[in-house]
């Protein structure tokens, strides 16, 4: 009885009594299979032959003996590892080179463990705690001070000021007026109720007013131009009897020369320089 023939799919050499490899149900001699189908090792660039173990990670292949940490050269076979810039690193080397350090305990935050980030620093989840109650803050609201981070209840208990207007806690910013704290959004003109936090303002009987309201309600009016005399920014004004003038408005009613620092004469509600007033039946 004739023995059936069994050939390599590629080179057609007989495979009887020889090792072979099946690929898509087709037989290949070992040399043809290695030449045609073998992957190339990422490390040594040699083919990974059919008799060798082929280790694959993200489409790249290694011989078992080449699958090592690129920094310490220890084998990564059946060990945890991580990739950094296409380099494979064992857990220890990755931690030393790439992992963040906890801002509190200064120890490495291991890959895969949960970490908290705040203002560019990192913490172990168990190290990111309220400075007062020592409970983990996690993703809950917090308030930061130079002395540390605080959960909202502890901050309110230890540090918070209460707004003089709404009586609620001031958690950040705020304004002090008459030694009393205010939310910026609560510090309003007592007349028109607009916010004063970015405005110049005046006060009357301990109440704040924007300049428009204060001038309208309380400022004296210039006897010449009738506009308010505010006295802001060191503005100068002249008082005589029961009348006031802006210094730039205190001029002779006839020739308009400035009378600031000069002698003057009056007639009814007019003021004159001595020259112009000499021909007028003046009061002085």
UniProtKB/Swiss-Prot annotation:
InterPro entries: FHL5_LIM2, LIM_FHL1/2/3/5_N, Znf_LIM. One of its GO terms (molecular function) is zinc ion binding. SUPFAM superfamilies: Glucocorticoid receptor-like (DNA-binding domain) (SSF57716). It is found in: Nucleus. Its main location: nucleus. One of its GO terms (cellular component) is Z disc. GO terms for biological process: positive regulation of transcription by RNA polymerase II. Keywords: LIM domain, Metal-binding, Nucleus, Repeat, Zinc, Zinc-finger. Residues 39-100, 101-160, 161-220, 223-283 form the LIM zinc-binding domain. A zinc finger (C4-type) spans 8-32. May be involved in the regulation of spermatogenesis. Stimulates CREM transcriptional activity in a phosphorylation-independent manner. Interacts with CREM (via the third LIM domain). Interacts (via second LIM domain) with SPAG8. This is Four and a half LIM domains protein 5. The gene is FHL5.
């Amino acid at each position: 009885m004739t023995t059936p023939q069994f050939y390599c799919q590629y080179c057609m050499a007989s495979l009887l009594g020889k090792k072979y490899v099946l690929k898509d149900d087709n037989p290949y001699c070992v040399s043809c299979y290695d030449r045609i189908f073998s992957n190339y090792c990422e490390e040594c660039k040699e083919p990974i032959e059919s008799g060798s173990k082929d280790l694959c990670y993200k489409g790249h292949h290694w011989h078992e003996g080449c699958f090592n940490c690129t920094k310490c050269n220890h084998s990564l076979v059946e060990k945890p590892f991580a990739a950094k810039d296409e380099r494979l690193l064992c857990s220890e080397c990755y931690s030393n080179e790439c992992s963040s350090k906890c801002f509190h305990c200064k120890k490495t935050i291991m890959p895969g463990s949960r970490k908290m980030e705040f203002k560019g620093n990192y913490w172990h989840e168990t190290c990111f705690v309220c400075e007062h109650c020592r409970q983990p803050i996690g993703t809950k609201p917090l308030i930061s001070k130079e002395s540390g981070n605080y959960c909202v209840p502890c901050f309110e208990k230890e540090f918070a000021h209460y707004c003089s207007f709404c009586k609620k806690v001031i958690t950040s910013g705020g304004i002090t007026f008459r030694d009393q704290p205010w939310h910026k959004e609560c510090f309003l003109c007592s007349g028109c109720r607009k916010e004063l936090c970015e405005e110049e303002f005046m006060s009357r009987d301990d109440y704040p007013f924007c300049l428009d309201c204060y001038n309208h309600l309380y400022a004296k009016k210039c006897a010449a131009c009738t506009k308010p005399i505010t006295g802001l920014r060191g503005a100068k004004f002249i008082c005589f009897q029961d009348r006031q003038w802006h210094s730039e408005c205190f001029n002779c009613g006839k020739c308009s020369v400035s009378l600031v620092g000069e002698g003057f004469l009056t007639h009814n509600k007019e003021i004159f320089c001595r020259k112009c007033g000499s021909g007028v039946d003046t009061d002085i």
